[in-house]
């Protein structure tokens, strides 16, 4: 990871984790803290940044995800898409070198998915390394450099996004894409 061999129980695991951001399915925001406080939490309490500096950086990140006007709101006052964008800002506040996304749109209403994907697309355009678990095949095809298809905990197919998603070779990948891209049973070509 990051060019280093990592043993599961090694001391370098903690150091490597601090170089990564994580965005979960269910946002995991602190309900008793405002949006701004949620974004400031890690830099202040984990990294020891001065609160004034963390606040300024958090406001910049909230602007980046389109939520500067919600800085004083609490998570319960936000839509799911807004909460997920706060979660992205919170992860970015730790200045990660790479970000992990675990189904970031699966808990959202369909009309809110686009806002979250737009933020992720911006991160990709800025060069952020992202590992994304997703069923958003259009997004994966558009943004991913590489796609890995997992089944039963194992990678059954991997390669360039256009190859894996446009011309899958493994029967399980073909079946999955057929079901996701053609839920009505249309079995014509996937490309």
Each model region followed by its residue ranges:
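C-terminal boundary and immediately downstream tail of ABC-type ATPase nucleotide-binding domains
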Residues: 163-191
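ABC family nucleotide-binding domain
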Residues: 1-161
């Amino acid at each position: 990871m990051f060019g280093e061999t990592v043993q599961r129980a090694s001391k370098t695991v903690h150091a490597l984790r601090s170089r990564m951001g994580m965005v979960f399915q269910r946002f995991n925001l602190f309900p008793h803290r405002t949006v701004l406080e949620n974004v400031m939490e890690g830099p202040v309490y984990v990294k020891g940044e001065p609160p004034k500096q963390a606040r300024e950086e958090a406001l910049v990140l909230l602007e980046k995800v389109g939520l500067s006007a919600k800085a004083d709101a609490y998570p319960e006052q936000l839509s799911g898409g807004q909460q997920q964008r706060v979660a992205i800002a919170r992860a970015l506040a730790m200045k990660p070198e790479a970000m992990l996304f675990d189904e970031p749109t699966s808990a959202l209403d369909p009309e809110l998915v686009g806002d979250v994907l737009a933020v992720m697309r911006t991160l990709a355009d800025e060069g952020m390394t992202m590992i994304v678990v997703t069923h958003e095949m259009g997004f994966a095809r558009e943004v991913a450099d590489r796609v890995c298809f997992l089944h039963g905990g194992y990678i059954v197919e991997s390669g360039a996004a256009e190859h894996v998603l446009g011309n899958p070779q493994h029967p399980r990948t073909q079946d999955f894409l057929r079901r996701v891209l053609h839920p009505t049973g249309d079995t014509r070509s996937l490309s």
